[in-house]
C-alpha cells in the first residue's frame, strides 16, 4: 500500500529556499554565505496538534587552494570548511516544543598531483560532525524531578549554545562522533576519471560504513559521473546503490554560441 493511501493519512513534505552569495577574497581564498528558509511538514492527519514547522538557517563556507612543490612537480593543495544549518529551532506543535536543526561542521582537504601532462591523481579527506546536543537520558538512581530539570535545561538552550555544547556532551567521546570520508581519483587529460573511497561512521552514531567506486566522463559542455556503493555492515539502505549525476559547464555552453 502506498503511504499516501494508508489509513494514517501520511503526506509529509520538505521545502527549502536558498539565497547564496560567494566572493573571491584573494587569488587563493574564497568564501560563501547561504541564507535558507525551511518549511517541514510531517504530514500526519492523526494528530490535530501537529503543524508544519518553519525555520531559518545559514551556511558559511570557505575554500583555499595553493600550489605546493613536490619533487619536480607542483601539486595543488586544497582545504575547505562548511558550517551548515546554523539557525533557529523548528517546532511542529505551534511553538510548545522546539527541535534543533541538524547543524553540521565539515572540514576537508585534498592534494592533486600531476604525474605528467595527461595523468593526474588526487587524494582527499573529509571530516564531518553534527553540532546537535545529545538529549538527556535518565541515569540510574536519578529521580524523575532531577531528570525533568535536565530535560528542561536542554530545551531552553539557544541554537548557538546547543551547537557549542555538542562538542563536550557526547557520552561516547568527541572522536566517535566524527564521520570520516577518504577518497582517491585518477584522471586522464581531465576527461576520463576513475574514483574510489570509503565512508566511516561510528556504530553509536549511525553505523554507516561503505565503499564506493565510480567513473566519470567530461566533454566541453557537460560531465557524466556514476558511482556504486557497497556497504560493509548489514541492513544499510545505501547498500548496492547506483548513482548517476549530470552536470553542465555554463561557460562551455556560452562558448558554443559565440
Language-model features, listed with the residues they occupy:
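Outer-membrane beta-barrel porins/channels
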Residues: 4-258
Amino acid at each position: 500500500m502506498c503511504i499516501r493511501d494508508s489509513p494514517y493519512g501520511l503526506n509529509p513534505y520538505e521545502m527549502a529556499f536558498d539565497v547564496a552569495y560567494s566572493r573571491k577574497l584573494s587569488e587563493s581564498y574564497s568564501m560563501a554565505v547561504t541564507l535558507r528558509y525551511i518549511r517541514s511538514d510531517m504530514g500526519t492527519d492523526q494528530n490535530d496538534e501537529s503543524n508544519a514547522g518553519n525555520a531559518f538557517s545559514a551556511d558559511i563556507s570557505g575554500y583555499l587552494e595553493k600550489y605546493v612543490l613536490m619533487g619536480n612537480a607542483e601539486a595543488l593543495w586544497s582545504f575547505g570548511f562548511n558550517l551548515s544549518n546554523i539557525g533557529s529551532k523548528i517546532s511542529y506543535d505551534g511553538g510548545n516544543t522546539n527541535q534543533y536543526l541538524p547543524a553540521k561542521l565539515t572540514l576537508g582537504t585534498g592534494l592533486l598531483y600531476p604525474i605528467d601532462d595527461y595523468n593526474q591523481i588526487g587524494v582527499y579527506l573529509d571530516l564531518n560532525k553534527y553540532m546537535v546536543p545529545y538529549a538527556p537520558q535518565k541515569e540510574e538512581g536519578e529521580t524523575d524531578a532531577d531528570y525533568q530539570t535536565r530535560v528542561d535545561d536542554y530545551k531552553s538552550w539557544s541554537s548557538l549554545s546547543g551547537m557549542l555544547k555538542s562538542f563536550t556532551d557526547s557520552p561516547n567521546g568527541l572522536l566517535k562522533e566524527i564521520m570520516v570520508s577518504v577518497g582517491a581519483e585518477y584522471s586522464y587529460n581531465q576527461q576520463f576519471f576513475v574514483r574510489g573511497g570509503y565512508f566511516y561512521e561510528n556504530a553509536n552514531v549511525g553505523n554507516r560504513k561503505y565503499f564506493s567506486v565510480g567513473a566519470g566522463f567530461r566533454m566541453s559542455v557537460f560531465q557524466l559521473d556514476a558511482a556504486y556503493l557497497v556497504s560493509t555492515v548489514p541492513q544499510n539502505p545505501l547498500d548496492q546503490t547506483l548513482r548517476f549525476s549530470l552536470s553542465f559547464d555554463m561557460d562551455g555552453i556560452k562558448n558554443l554560441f559565440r
